[in-house]
A protein has these predicted regions:
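Membrane-interfacial helix termini and adjacent extracytoplasmic/periplasmic loops
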Residues: 21-28, 66-71, 115-116, 135-171, ...
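Periplasmic/extracellular loop-to-transmembrane helix junction in inner-membrane transport proteins
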Residues: 22-36, 57-95, 110-111, 258-266, ...
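Transmembrane-helix boundary motif in ABC transporter permease subunits
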Residues: 30, 72, 91-124, 136, ...
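Hydrophobic alpha-helical transmembrane segments of multipass integral membrane proteins
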Residues: 48, 84, 88-100, 104, ...
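Interhelical loop and adjacent transmembrane-helix boundary motif
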Residues: 31-35, 68-73, 77-78, 232-289, ...
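Transmembrane alpha-helices and adjacent helix-loop boundaries
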Residues: 128-135
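C-terminal transmembrane helix and the adjacent membrane-cytosol boundary/short C-terminal tail
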Residues: 5, 12, 37-38, 52, ...
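Transmembrane alpha-helices
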Residues: 40-45, 95, 125, 172-190, ...
Length: 322
């Protein structure tokens, strides 16, 4: 077993990896005239549609030097406010979706009740509705001409064209991410461990923190990462409910669009590069989480195999690392 919790079979088990049905063997059996065009096509598509545009964003942002880049990002008060607002709206929306996602996943996987299937369908509704339509729904509900707008306005509460509206719209469009990651995991886990914890005297909170949460942690973190990435880049719904007021309700995506409309290309590319950087950080975090989850799962399977006698301990190399 390696020091970081992973394990690999030694050379004695190596022939097993070269079986006829393994992916490596199938890959080697594919003709060269099939492999090369497919690989080149995949690389070309990724390069032209992803790598080149992303690289161009950073090139355009830094084309006039780092001093101009810094000025465009942090010396413009409207841009500073857009960055600040984005860094407020995204975490708050993620926190709300974590609470909702855990509650929804728990209700769907631990209880059977009338309308359960309908609830699962409703969780996916934000994926099907256009973000612009979602924003319009909140305007019609909470705007000054909406159903609840006059009542809220008479009590000094403003939702549309203010921070609460931005959070509400962002939370809506990112609603399914956490719940959709947790539901299949919690269904697969079942309730045996939780029932055992309760039978040993644990209360509900102890059961959740010590049994349920450790089992769903990777799915929860994965959902949080996806939710945060979407929240920071949301444009359509936020555009409708924000009023597009510079220095007040503009988030970073809205600021990019406004600077571009004003022919301030260096400024728009600077803000776009910051958004892209945040997206790349999110991608790296996603890859890291997937690797950690895969290693943890593999370690558990190997340990279970050794305990069951299916894998001889001598086939586990204590020094080899992945």
């Amino acid at each position: 077993m390696s020091v970081n919790g992973s394990a690999r079979p030694t050379s004695e088990a190596a022939p097993a990896a070269a079986t006829a049905g393994s992916p490596e063997r199938r890959y080697r059996q594919d003709p060269l005239w099939i492999r090369v065009p497919l690989i080149l096509t995949g690389v070309a598509i990724v390069g032209l549609l992803i790598v080149v545009p992303v690289a161009n964003v950073f090139y355009q942002a830094l084309a006039r030097g780092f001093g101009t880049y810094w000025h465009n990002l942090f010396d413009d008060p409207d841009t500073r406010q857009a960055i600040k607002l984005t860094l407020i709206v995204a975490p708050v929306s993620v926190a709300l979706n974590v609470s909702f996602g855990i509650a929804a996943a728990w209700a769907v996987t631990r209880f059977r009740f009338p309308g359960r299937t309908f609830l699962v369908t409703l969780i996916d509704l934000p994926f099907a509705i256009s973000p612009v339509v979602a924003g319009l729904m909140f305007v019609l509900l909470f705007g000054l001409q909406g159903y609840l707008g006059p009542w809220l306005h008479s009590r000094g509460v403003q939702i549309i064209f203010a921070l609460p509206g931005l959070i509400l719209a962002t939370t809506f469009v990112t609603l399914p991410f956490v719940a959709r990651e947790l539901i299949p995991v919690m269904e697969a886990l079942g309730t045996d461990e939780e029932a055992a914890a309760l039978s040993l005297g644990a209360d509900g909170w102890q059961m959740f923190w010590r049994v349920t949460l450790p089992n769903i942690k990777w799915a929860l973190l994965y959902g949080v990462i996806l939710c945060n990435a979407r929240a920071m880049g949301e444009f359509g719904a936020v555009y409708v409910v924000s009023g597009h007021i510079a220095g007040q309700t503009d988030t970073m995506p809205l600021r990019v669009q406004k600077l571009f409309d004003e022919y301030n290309n260096p400024g728009s590319f600077a803000v776009a590069s910051l958004l892209t950087s945040l997206a790349l950080v999110t991608l790296l975090a996603k890859v890291w989480l997937e690797r950690k989850a895969r290693l943890e799962r593999k370690t558990g399977e190997l340990a279970a195999g050794v305990l069951a006698g299916a894998i001889p301990p001598r086939l586990i190399d204590p020094l080899e690392t992945p």
